[in-house]
């Protein structure tokens, strides 16, 4: 009821929200299920490990199933998600829904990473950015080497408490029916003695990992640009479609150490130098400065940045919408 009924096509810019956490409200005000031709953007993946808000759950909702009868197109931000989405649509008899891929745009007129910036940086960091669909423990396990001058860092961001340890985190261990509680204080955990040596070594290992990472709660936009212009980024992705952090690194020529997820390969290509298969390989690669410089050079010279501009996105999307409207 909040759209012009004379329009040929209804557009939903966040289908996931409409049919998941916004479903109750939109159903109450009779916006959904859609019963007219519509299209929209899908942002989440099929991963079920992080939240109940995922595409597996969305396809289970009756409102979405009914709405699919009237859907003419869905838009996603990766070929990886497009293939999964098309397969699911086919499985439920909705092959009439076209799925289009667009590249997520970002600001491209930004401060760039340079070798000089990195070398002159007196507080070099490898920064894990964000927590959504990331293994946020991996940065704690990454082994930089005893002589490394690169500080492991987490840029936490807002509403990310659930993905990183809180500063008042505590661990309870029950041994021989006796429960002992410890906080993550490096000093405390390395001075304590436990009867069970397994737990003794385990808690000390966790304490060392915990203290090996500096957590930055948040930064301003300008501070973020500066960080990415002279440091390295680290990601261990559980799943992905559009990865804003990767795109932000690409337009800045910033080296990023990342696992070789299909959606990332679409952005960085198959031969990017700082992919890793496991944390042992990640730890080995980051200790070699040549790998860092090769990754920077690759991003700076081998990737066409035009497709990340807002203009390119707008033109591509407008052409698709025009063709859809012309065909209905």
Where are these predicted regions, by residue range?
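Nucleotide-activated donor-binding/catalytic signature segment of Leloir-type glycosyltransferases, i.e.
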Residues: 165-219
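Donor nucleotide-sugar binding/catalytic pocket of nucleotide-sugar-dependent glycosyltransferases
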Residues: 70-87, 91-113
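Active-site proximal beta-strand in glycosyltransferases
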Residues: 9-11, 28-52, 102
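A charged, aromatic-enriched C-terminal amphipathic alpha-helix characteristic of glycosyltransferases
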Residues: 280, 290-328
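Short hydrophobic beta-strand element within catalytic cores of glycosyltransferases
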Residues: 255-258
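Membrane-proximal helix-turn-helix segments that form the acceptor-binding/catalytic region
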Residues: 55-74, 201-206
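Conserved donor-binding/catalytic core segment of Leloir-type glycosyltransferases
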Residues: 117-156
């Amino acid at each position: 009821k909040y759209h012009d009924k004379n329009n040929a096509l209804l557009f939903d810019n966040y289908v996931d929200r409409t049919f998941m956490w916004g479903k109750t409200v939109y159903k109450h005000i009779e916006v959904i299920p859609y019963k007219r031709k519509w299209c929209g953007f899908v942002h989440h993946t099929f991963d079920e490990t992080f939240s109940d808000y995922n595409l597996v759950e969305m396809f289970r909702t009756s409102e979405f199933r009914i709405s699919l009868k009237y859907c003419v197109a869905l838009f996603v931000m990766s070929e990886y998600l497009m293939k999964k989405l098309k397969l699911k649509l086919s499985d439920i008899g909705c092959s009439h829904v076209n799925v289009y891929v667009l590249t997520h745009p970002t600001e491209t007129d930004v401060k760039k990473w340079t070798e000089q910036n990195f070398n002159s940086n007196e507080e070099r960091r490898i920064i894990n950015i964000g927590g959504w669909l990331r293994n946020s423990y991996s940065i704690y396990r990454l082994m930089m080497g005893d002589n490394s001058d690169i500080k492991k860092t987490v840029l936490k961001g807002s509403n990310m408490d659930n993905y990183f340890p809180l500063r008042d985190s505590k661990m309870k261990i029950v041994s021989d029916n006796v429960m002992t509680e410890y906080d993550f204080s490096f000093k405390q955990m390395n001075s304590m003695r436990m009867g069970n040596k397994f737990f003794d070594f385990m808690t000390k290992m966790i304490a060392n990992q915990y203290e090996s990472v500096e957590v930055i709660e948040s930064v301003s936009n300008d501070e973020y640009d500066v960080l990415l212009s002279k440091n390295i980024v680290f990601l261990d992705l559980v799943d992905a479609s559009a990865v804003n952090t990767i795109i932000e690194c690409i337009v800045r020529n910033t080296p990023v150490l990342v696992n070789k997820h299909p959606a990332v390969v679409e952005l960085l290509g198959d031969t990017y130098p700082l992919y890793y298969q496991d944390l042992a390989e990640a730890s080995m690669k980051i200790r070699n400065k040549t790998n860092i410089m090769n990754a920077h050079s690759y991003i700076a010279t081998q990737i066409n940045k035009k497709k990340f501009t807002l203009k390119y996105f707008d033109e591509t999307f407008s052409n698709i919408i025009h063709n859809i409207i012309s065909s209905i």
